[in-house]
Amino acid sequence: MENTVLNLDSDVIHACEAIFQPIRLVYTHAQTPDVSGVSMLEKIQQILPQIAKNAESAEQLRRVPDENIKLLKEIGLHRAFQPKVYGGLEMSLPDFANCIVTLAGACAGTAWAFSLLCTHSHQIAMFSKQLQDEIWLKDPDATASSSIAPFGKVEEVEGGIILNGDYGWSSGCDHAEYAIVGFNRFDADGNKIYSFGVIPRSDYEIVDNWYAQAIKSSGSKMLKLVNVFIPEYRISKAKDMMEGKSAGFGLYPDSKIFYTPYRPYFASGFSAVSLGIAERMIEAFKEKQRNRVRAYTGANVGLATPALMRIAESTHQVAAARALLEKTWEDHRIHGLNHQYPNKETLAFWRTNQAYAVKMCIEAVDRLMAAAGATSFMDNSELQRLFRDAHMTGAHAYTDYDVCAQILGRELMGMEPDPTMV
């Protein structure tokens, strides 16, 4: 046989591009266009260069830049899960999640914070009609940040509660008109009732304490509440929201998204951001490797066999993560379409699938970063930002796979849920 000479500058690069192509395009066909014929994903792609350009300055700012918020609101993404009666879009979870994946490749902090501002609208739609009217009839563009761990101290009073406390990790709070906060009430027998309340921006102070090493631009600051009165119509039991018993459940009988619990919507952004980071890491690694040579010998290391093996394995791993998430998102969409409330096992899979996908994305990013060279750790390197941000997506309580593995394992073995794991 005649020996074949492989042209590393063309043949290998084209082969790698063929591998990457399915990842970039796998879900674009599913987007639903608006009346102008342009899908939300296409609108995201149009503003993506400016979002990416702002990424480094956004880290220095430690919150989402005003320009990014303006761009995203101009295309209407903040209305993704708002009821149509208030001008919302009621997007399907697959369509929305893929927008966040794309956005995260440009700026993970922006994607993290804005996805939560969007998904909180789904949760608000589970509260009373009185609350929804109060928010969206006054300002149809209003959004809410959140801090739902029960940090505060509750005092029961006539018509509601008085709440005091410091509420951390409220991503996107600088750009929200309201906040959803968590707290514990107690019934007559002394049992805890985990609940949520909605408060307007005038009722709390934002404490600028967000000094993090990753997802820096999310602006996940602390909310300080001092003697805040929350009336009953702005309060809901968390359990009711997960079981279809809240005041807002059933208000929108024609909706395809409000017959599933709020929590899978709330959490969808975490895994979508992780996936977007990992997919961008593959592209950024490929761009860097094209002309990378060893400093001491001049040898081409970027297209050497070890680099090709790493990029191949990470590509497969990220594709597997995407496939798992797409199946989860689509299952969620079908449940909503059929007004079919998910059972406990389905909810357990929805929760834990996302955490496992995040785990795979982090592993894929780590594999590439380990072979990206010292310059990839410089402050101005996109790769080190992607590396840091990827790990932060796995640090959230909802994406902790050690917890999620126990949740799913208990469900699969017919055991009762552990109340210490949420």
Curated annotation (Swiss-Prot):
Transmembrane segments: none
Effect of residue 396 to N: Decrease in rate constant for the formation of the reaction intermediate by 30-fold. Denatured above pH 10
Residues annotated to bind FMN: 112, 146-148, 169-171, 292, 296, 374-375, 396-397
Keyword Nuclease assigned: no
Functional pH dependence: Optimum pH is 6-10.
InterPro entries referenced in this protein's UniProt entry, alphabetically: Acyl-CoA_dehydrogenase, Acyl-CoA_DH_C, Acyl-CoA_Oxase/DH_mid-dom_sf, AcylCo_DH-like_C, AcylCoA_DH/ox_N, AcylCoA_DH/ox_N_sf, AcylCoA_DH/oxidase_NM_dom_sf
Task performed by this protein: Oxygenase component of a two-component system that utilizes reduced FMN (FMNH2) supplied by the reductase component to catalyze the hydroxylation of 4-hydroxyphenylacetic acid, leading to the production of 3,4-dihydroxyphenylacetate (3,4-DHPA). Also utilizes other reduced flavins such as FADH2 and reduced riboflavin to a lesser extent. Only the compounds with a hydroxyl group in the para (p-) position can be hydroxylated. May also oxidize phenol to catechol, and hydroxylate other phenol derivatives.
Protein name: p-hydroxyphenylacetate 3-hydroxylase, oxygenase component
Organism for this UniProt entry: Acinetobacter baumannii
Biological classification of the source: Bacteria, Pseudomonadati, Pseudomonadota, Gammaproteobacteria, Moraxellales
